[in-house]
């Protein structure tokens, strides 16, 4: 997957997905399809500027990005090991003067308050010096107990914006 460093987002759609198949490549393709991100060439983004954005849904993202041959993705694609339970979370806060997106993937028990929410609230309150609004969060969990199939988990913020 191609990569870029930083992007100034204009529109953000957060999504998650899982896939299971007999090989990694197909499991990943199914996880991307489940997340709705299988229609474009993905370009991985390593960071986002914290400018205000518009949070949108899948249909609006597809409509707004229909003229582009690629899509910017900020997130993670992970493979679940045999005997492991993996959790994925992605959160977004958007206000008139600041926005932020964080994600996390981890194995083990699911947390009552997602890591991505905690980290995003801390980032918001540190930067803005006021209480954070409640983040919008999507979570996903997948446990692998089948040695004959590969399991893949996707957490992603799909971005329409300009590289910096």
Residue ranges and their predicted role:
Residues 1-164:
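Helix-coil modules at protein/domain termini and other flexible surface or pore-lining loops
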């Amino acid at each position: 997957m191609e990569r870029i460093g930083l992007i100034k987002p204009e529109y953000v759609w957060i999504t998650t997905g899982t896939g299971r198949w007999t090989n990694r490549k197909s499991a990943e393709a199914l996880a991307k399809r489940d997340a709705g991100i299988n229609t474009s060439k993905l370009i991985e983004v390593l960071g986002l500027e914290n400018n205000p954005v518009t949070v949108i849904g899948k249909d609006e993202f597809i409509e707004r990005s229909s003229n582009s041959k690629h899509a910017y993705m900020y997130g993670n694609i992970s493979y679940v090991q045999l005997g492991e339970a993996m959790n994925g979370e992605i959160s977004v806060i958007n206000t008139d003067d600041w926005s932020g997106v964080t994600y996390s993937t981890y194995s083990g028990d699911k947390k009552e308050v997602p890591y991505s929410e905690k980290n995003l609230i801390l980032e918001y309150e540190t930067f803005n010096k006021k209480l954070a609004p409640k983040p919008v969060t999507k979570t996903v969990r997948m446990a692998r107990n089948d040695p004959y199939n590969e399991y893949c988990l996707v957490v992603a913020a799909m971005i329409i914006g300009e590289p910096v």
